[in-house]
């Protein structure tokens, strides 16, 4: 409580979704709370959800200022803002809060509350910028009645790797299974950012794994993350290799990749090629060589063509190994793109002002959709290579915990209907994001930074604004006031966007790249891609859009412990399963709210026993993204579908998004030309 300089302020005006409400503001240790007789329920906002706070001179209504220094209102607005009539809008102090979930609200403090406004601002800063995760709400949160009544298993135990791989058709205890469970990382000493249980080829020893780890960034060796039973194909994941400038190689790493590509349950399935996927742009991957990293030298990994001492019988027609650069941008590009999108969407959100269409149409704003489209394009290519070529796939980026997690998890959603179910999606997140070390704490910025806070009143002089000697008052207009200018008066009542306060808002909104260097909405971007698949296949997902939206909220709310660590090791070091609750408690206890009523129950891939008829298994429908239908997630942004997507739908076919030809590379060192992954043309497989 020592962080709270003031706990309660009366007669504060809350502006939210275009509605002004006068009431009482409360500041608690973990939430900002606003109550008013005009509200049916209290408004609660958790501090970790804060994306930015701006303390500005004047009321937020100055954003509605017209060329005549009037706030022109009509209809219901007249009653909504009646409490401002006759008051000098510059006499107020406004605190505007932008949420990581795109919620925007502002608090107006009257002329006699300036000191209280300062204390509120300082208190919010103190309660938001923290030094340790134990200060977060999750560590004192007590489950409600619904969550306490949940049946077993405990939500922390919803993902059991042995059980999950058995569902996929792999029983590690069966000696005939080509994959085994390794405990080399049982105490996280082998690789601190990997899960304790690793599935590797049965033909490899733990000694080989230890030697191979020296050749991979962060020791994140290639391991199995998914087995597709219908095609007997495997998806592996790792980090980048470490050839460096002198082009080093590792026989053990090459052996591990070879054995992984050669570990089949069904040896009779014809395979044409396997794929090593580097999710980065080609130039970025090669530039990493100067830092000791890099990408695979395909002379060493194309086992049928290479002299690599793997004991490969070259008289056999073995599948070739192809390398593919996806060209997906890094976390810094994602962060900058999301920051600009947030600025455009959230400015004026407290007053529910319309989006500026010239910004919506801009190239810079649309970059977010282009990033997502490229990810989905990449997933589409890999999906069809697995389905039609029966290819094994190894995916990595730099460290293998951002772009790699996005690609492999989306690929699994497209391949396996189980991951499109309510519980299946939770297991997927636990498997490919939490256990494989996506840095949730770091990427989400839960401990925040004071760079998010902008006090624009520190050096303000309220008298330096030219108002022609008059106060800025609310002018309440009747129907007659607008009768004469019904057609021609629009220009005179347009909003002024160039006021000093608006400029300051825009300038201060930019993130400090140094202080928040590793904060990036990577997991949110993944959820956005899942949203695209859901809207394109509305009857093939058991969960609904609201499920994804609430997951974004609880990614940042810090009410639960699931997203408060950077790895499985950190989760247990912080004792999160015992000290906090799992986020899946929230969803499982409210299941009916998040179930899609249009979901068509189908036979789930690999869910039955191993003797399940394979022909029936192959009838299970896989899905692929329709790149022409990628759209804005308007529900998340609190905007109208027409406002964000109408223009996009009109020009949908005019600017196709594709992977750069330079991103496709043949496995031979002298190739370097574009390559079709499938022996078929991809464009002919638009069916779901």
UniProtKB/Swiss-Prot annotation:
Disruption phenotype: Exhibits increased phosphatidylinositol 3-monophosphate (PI3P) level. One of its GO terms (molecular function) is phosphatidylinositol-3-phosphate phosphatase activity. Residues 647-668 have a biased composition (Basic and acidic residues). Keywords: Cytoplasm, Hydrolase. One of its GO terms (biological process) is phosphatidylinositol dephosphorylation. It holds the Pfam family PH-GRAM_MTMR6-like. GO terms for cellular component: cytoplasm; membrane. It catalyses: a 1,2-diacyl-sn-glycero-3-phospho-(1D-myo-inositol-3-phosphate) + H2O = a 1,2-diacyl-sn-glycero-3-phospho-(1D-myo-inositol) + phosphate. It is found in: Cytoplasm. Lipid phosphatase which dephosphorylates phosphatidylinositol 3-monophosphate (PI3P). Involved in the control of PI3P-dependent signaling and in the maintenance of endosomal system integrity. Present with 1080 molecules/cell in log phase SD medium. PANTHER family: MYOTUBULARIN-RELATED (PTHR10807), PHOSPHATIDYLINOSITOL-3,5-BISPHOSPHATE 3-PHOSPHATASE (PTHR10807:SF128). This is Phosphoinositide 3-phosphatase. It comes from Saccharomyces cerevisiae (strain ATCC 204508 / S288c).
């Amino acid at each position: 409580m020592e962080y709270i300089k003031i706990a309660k302020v009366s007669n504060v005006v809350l502006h939210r979704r275009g509605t002004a409400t006068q009431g009482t503001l409360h500041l608690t240790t973990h939430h900002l709370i606003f109550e008013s007789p005009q509200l049916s329920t209290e408004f609660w906002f958790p501090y970790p959800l804060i994306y930015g706070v701006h303390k500005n001179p004047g009321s937020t209504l100055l954003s509605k200022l017209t060329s005549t220094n009037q706030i022109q209102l009509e209809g219901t607005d007249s009653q909504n803002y009646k409490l401002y009539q006759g008051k000098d809008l510059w006499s107020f102090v406004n605190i505007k809060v932008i949420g990581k979930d795109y919620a925007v609200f502002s608090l107006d403090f009257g002329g006699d509350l300036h000191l209280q406004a300062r204390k509120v601002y300082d208190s919010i800063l103190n309660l938001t910028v923290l030094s340790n995760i134990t200060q977060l709400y999750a560590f004192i949160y007590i489950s409600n009645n619904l969550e306490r009544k949940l049946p077993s298993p405990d939500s922390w135990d919803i993902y059991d790797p042995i059980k999950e791989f058995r569902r996929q058709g792999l029983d590690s205890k069966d000696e005939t299974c080509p994959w085994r469970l390794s405990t080399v990382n049982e105490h996280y000493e082998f690789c601190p950012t990997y899960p304790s249980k690793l599935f590797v080829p049965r033909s490899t020893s733990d000694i080989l794994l230890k030697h191979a780890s020296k050749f991979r960034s962060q020791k994140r060796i290639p391991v199995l993350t998914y087995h597709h039973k219908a095609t007997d194909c495997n998806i592996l994941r790792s980090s980048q290799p470490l050839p460096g400038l002198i082009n080093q190689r590792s026989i053990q790493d090459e052996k591990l990749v070879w054995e992984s590509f050669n570990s089949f349950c069904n040896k009779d399935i014809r395979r044409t090629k396997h794929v090593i996927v580097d999710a980065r742009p080609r130039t970025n991957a090669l530039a990493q060589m100067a830092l000791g990293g890099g990408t695979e030298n395909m002379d060493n990994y194309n086992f049928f063509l290479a002299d690599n001492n793997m004991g490969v019988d070259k008289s056999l027609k073995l599948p070739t190994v192809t390398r593919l650069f996806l060209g997906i941008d890094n976390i810094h590009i994602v962060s900058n793109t999301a920051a600009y999108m947030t600025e455009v969407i959230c400015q004026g959100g407290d007053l529910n002002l319309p989006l500026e269409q010239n910004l919506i149409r801009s190239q810079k704003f649309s970059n977010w959709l282009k990033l997502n489209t490229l990810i989905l394009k990449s997933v589409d290519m890999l999906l069809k290579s697995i389905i039609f070529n029966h290819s094994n796939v190894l995916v990595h980026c730099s460290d293998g915990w951002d772009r790699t997690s996005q690609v492999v998890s989306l690929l699994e959603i497209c391949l396996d209907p189980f991951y499109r179910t309510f519980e299946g999606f939770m297991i997927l997140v636990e498997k490919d994001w939490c256990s494989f070390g996506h840095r949730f704490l770091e990427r989400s910025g839960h401990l925040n930074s004071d760079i998010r806070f902008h006090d624009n009143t520190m050096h303000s002089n309220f008298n330096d604004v030219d108002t022609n000697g008059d106060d800025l008052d609310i002018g309440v207009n009747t129907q007659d006031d607008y009768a004469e200018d019904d057609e021609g008066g629009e220009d005179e009542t347009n909003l002024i966007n160039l006021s000093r306060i608006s400029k300051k808002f825009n300038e201060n909104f930019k993130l400090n790249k140094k202080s928040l260097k590793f904060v990036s909405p990577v997991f949110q971007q993944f959820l956005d891609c899942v949203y695209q698949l859901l809207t394109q296949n509305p009857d093939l997902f058991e969960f609904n859009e609201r499920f994804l939206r609430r997951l974004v909220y609880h990614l940042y709310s810090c009410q639960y412990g699931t997203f408060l660590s950077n790895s499985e090791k950190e989760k247990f070091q912080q004792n999160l399963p015992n000290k906090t609750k799992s986020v899946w408690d929230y969803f499982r206890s409210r299941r009916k709210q998040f179930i899609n009523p249009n979901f068509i129950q189908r036979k789930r891939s690999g869910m039955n026993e191993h003797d399940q008829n394979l022909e029936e298994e192959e009838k299970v429908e896989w899905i692929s993204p329709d790149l022409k239908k990628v759209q804005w997630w308007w529900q998340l942004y609190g905007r109208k579908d027409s406002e964000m997507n109408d223009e996009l739908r009109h020009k949908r076919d005019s600017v196709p998004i594709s992977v750069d030809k330079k991103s496709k590379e043949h496995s031979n060192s002298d190739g370097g030309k574009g390559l079709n992954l499938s022996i078929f043309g991809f464009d002919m497989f638009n069916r779901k």
